[in-house]
Design a protein with these regions (language model features):
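Non-ligating segments of multi-cofactor redox enzymes
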Residues: 1-112
């Protein structure tokens, strides 16, 4: 849907936005089934949560800041391709469903 190809899926499966290519047309905001994209008022570019991938690249952090900061443990992050990961086990144990059903091959789940 992006006319410039600014929206992409990284090798890690995380959707991102190349801010150097984004022209701020907002097409991706309108098309996003999760309604999670936001417009940066300063730059005009669209952005979204990148699960702290930028932070991890520079600091070596292994967990998203929101997961670390959540006092109730309501957020989890992990490798869905590893059946022994905590998140994979939690999804099986709770019969968690993808946030948008199977329509988008979502990797974000409602666990509880």
């Amino acid at each position: 849907v992006c006319p410039t190809g600014a929206a992409y899926i990284g090798a890690d499966g995380i959707v991102g936005v190349d801010h150097g290519r984004c022209i701020g047309c907002l097409y991706c905001m309108a098309a996003c089934p999760y309604q999670v994209r936001v417009r940066n008022e300063e730059t005009g570019a669209v952005d979204k949560c990148r699960f702290c991938t930028v932070s991890a690249e520079t600091t070596g952090a292994k967990m998203c800041s929101c997961v670390e900061a959540c006092l109730t443990g309501a957020r989890m992050f992990g490798d869905l391709d590893d059946p022994d990961s905590d998140i994979s086990k939690e999804i099986v144990a709770t019969n968690a469903q993808p946030i948008a059903g199977d329509l988008t091959k979502s990797k974000v789940f409602y666990v509880r």
